[in-house]
């Protein structure tokens, strides 16, 4: 089996496949991993969680076709996801693969997680009193109010953080208060990426991707998302500060607490996914290192391989 470098005469490099949700990144990664002698390193924050399969569109074991996937199913739903911890584990996985002569494929739509691997992303300190005050604001007024406040202070960070992600909103507002600088100012300016990485972005026409999102959400509910949430409730999903706020899961939990209208939960989930796609697109389009491809184009895998050989 060949590697990325087989025609380059050098060691394999990291290939990052990024872009909005629903574009086909995971499927392309498996195709390329088979051809390049590679393994996938997950960069989707919610696919870190065990049991969160249907609602995150995690590839099944069969769909992975024997390609090893790293950093899937590594957290319990009660654990809080941390970009700093992810950075350590993902870089370790990438470096082990490179040392073994394997091609790492960093795959996902969580922009901050991707940047944590590729760039010199540092993490500002914390202030427990400031954080506690913002957590109280979250409890009293809700995540949407904090998101509006963040948009006033740092529109770039607001684009990158979901209005439902209270934990990340609190952290961003905490950093702004204790440093006196926008949260986004702590993000590194993209330069030469670590590991000599090649960055590939997938996107689709807006209407086409919206339709794909709607179909994906319909299938999630048809394929048992509500049952998955009920099972995860038994494992402490409601106590999970990160997992309980994932798109789809939060909406199902709300309906289980209320009228039980899962059609309404599905409609809200689809709407929020479409909104999330636009935020992802805005985040990734700022990174000029990314080579963009229409995910619908024929021969996509071959075109990406050709890019690696240039």
From Swiss-Prot:
It holds the Pfam family IPPT. Keywords: ATP-binding, Magnesium, Nucleotide-binding, Transferase, tRNA processing. It catalyses: adenosine(37) in tRNA + dimethylallyl diphosphate = N(6)-dimethylallyladenosine(37) in tRNA + diphosphate. Its EC number is 2.5.1.75. GO terms for biological process: tRNA modification. SUPFAM superfamilies: P-loop containing nucleoside triphosphate hydrolases. The keyword Isomerase does not apply. InterPro entries: Dimethylallyltransferase, IPT, P-loop_NTPase. Belongs to the IPP transferase family. Monomer. HAMAP family: IPP_trans. Catalyzes the transfer of a dimethylallyl group onto the adenine at position 37 in tRNAs that read codons beginning with uridine, leading to the formation of N6-(dimethylallyl)adenosine (i(6)A). This is tRNA dimethylallyltransferase. It comes from Saccharopolyspora erythraea (strain ATCC 11635 / DSM 40517 / JCM 4748 / NBRC 13426 / NCIMB 8594 / NRRL 2338). The gene is miaA.
